[in-house]
Design a protein with these regions (language model features):
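Conserved, mostly hydrophobic/aromatic
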Residues: 3, 28, 51, 89, ...
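Glycine-rich phosphate/pyrophosphate-binding beta-alpha loops
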Residues: 11-14, 34-42, 75, 122-129
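Shared catalytic-loop signature of beta/alpha-barrel
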Residues: 46, 51, 65, 237-244, ...
Length: 395
């Protein structure tokens, strides 16, 4: 079997662009994968198109060879964009391989370890603050005050979610706003230091959510790159009484992350922004986190399984970074089904309602668990007609 064509397709996803790669073969089998576009500040699409020139003619059933060969061409100028582009091609090859053998992707790696995976509600409330007009247009209740966070907590429990994760939301201006400094351009985002008042406001926000959740549903906070080591420690120590499922943060320095983990009783989750086994090695071998977050769309599912195996050797659980659409959900689900050391899976349940039509078989969730399908490949194809019905706006 040979790759004959590689295309990228995109559609309007509301506040984001939904992006897909389509890999065609000489035997008529088509492989799909979802990928992120824009996280690096520029588009990954031209990078995928550049790698496509080398990938055409390769055998997609040899997905590991395809991935390693393409990555080898980047050694003098490796980086996140290259990894993400190669990962998209690798993942589409995995879909082809599963379809060619008539099995789900997890079966290519000895799975499944489980037939369902617990999920948590990510960006709970915070994205409704960040994109208020869109969410109200889609029929979701707005978040205007702390009482609305309590209401959302109750809603999450009623839907069976095992945990929820939010981001800092402040109410000290005329309108509430989400603050996730460190990498998103906003006033003061380069300071990377919360004031005592801001930390106090974060505690109040989490207390409001906890009131709605009760004591048996996990509560997480994601502050991304918003602090330096000292700031992360101040925040983590202030949150200890809340008994968080985890505090999620990002840093490029393994020693700093180790200082944070060892300096607080709050469980620490991190590493979602890393690419490749070698970047993960010092963090995992140094036991810098309670939960290692791996992105199977940025790294590729096969490469991510290698990272997860390394984590397992150091008694560390894995959770996938997964703030994407329905095909991405299915890809992360297959990744989780192939792992023994997965803890929980990220899910954004309040997306633009039309995005479920972008796949032929949307994921099924029962009592807070996403069910692992037995269909070949990822378990669904992309609905190209639905993509055409929702073209990108203002491109």
């Amino acid at each position: 079997m040979k790759i004959t064509k590689i295309e990228t397709l995109q559609a309007d996803g509301g506040y984001r662009i939904c992006s897909y790669i389509k890999v065609s073969t000489d035997e008529g089998i088509v492989g799909w994968a979802e990928f992120y576009d824009g996280f690096a500040g520029v588009s990954v699409v031209p990078v995928i198109q550049g790698f496509a020139k080398s990938a055409i003619g390769m055998n997609p059933l040899h997905y590991a060879h395809v991935s390693e060969t393409l990555l080898a061409t980047t050694r003098l100028a490796s980086g996140g964009l290259s990894h993400q582009a190669v990962a998209a091609i690798e993942n589409a090859c995995l879909d082809i391989c599963g379809k060619a053998r008539g099995v789900p992707v997890h079966a290519l790696f000895g799975g499944p370890f489980r037939d369902r995976v617990p999920v948590y509600w990510t960006h709970c409330g915070s994205f409704r603050v960040r994109y208020p007009a869109l969410y109200e247009k889609w029929g979701y209740e707005p978040v205007r005050n702390l009482n609305d966070f309590t209401r959302l907590g109750k809603e999450a429990v009623s839907q069976g979610f095992k945990a929820v994760k939010t981001n800092p939301v402040f109410f000290d201006k005329s309108e509430p706003y989400m603050f996730n400094g460190g990498f998103r351009i906003a006033p003061g985002f380069l300071d990377r230091s919360y004031t005592d008042a801001q930390i106090g406001a974060i505690v109040e926000q989490l207390e409001a959510l906890r009131e709605g959740l009760g004591q048996h549903t996990g509560l997480m906070l994601d502050v991304s790159f918003s602090q330096r080591t000292e700031g992360y420690l101040r925040l983590a120590r202030k949150l200890e009484a809340l008994n968080l499922y985890w505090l999620e943060l990002d840093t490029r320095d393994a020693e700093s992350l180790s200082l944070i983990r060892n300096g607080t009783r709050t469980p620490i989750a991190s590493l979602e922004s890393l690419h490749g086994l070698s970047e993960y090695r010092p963090f995992i071998a140094g036991r810098t986190v309670d939960m290692a977050i791996v992105d199977p769309l940025w790294n590729g599912v096969w490469q991510s399984l290698r990272i997860a195996t390394l984590a397992d050797a150091f008694e560390t659980h894995i959770a996938p970074h997964n703030p994407v659409g329905e095909l991405g959900n299915l890809m992360s689900l297959q990744f989780c089904a192939a792992l023994s050391n997965v803890r929980i899976m990220e899910l954004r349940p309040d997306e633009a309602p039309w995005t479920r039509s972008f796949v032929t078989h949307p994921p099924e969730i029962v009592n807070g668990d996403m069910l692992v399908p037995n269909r070949p490949g990822w378990g669904a194809d992309v609905n190209e007609e639905a993509l055409r019905e929702h073209p990108i706006k203002n491109k």
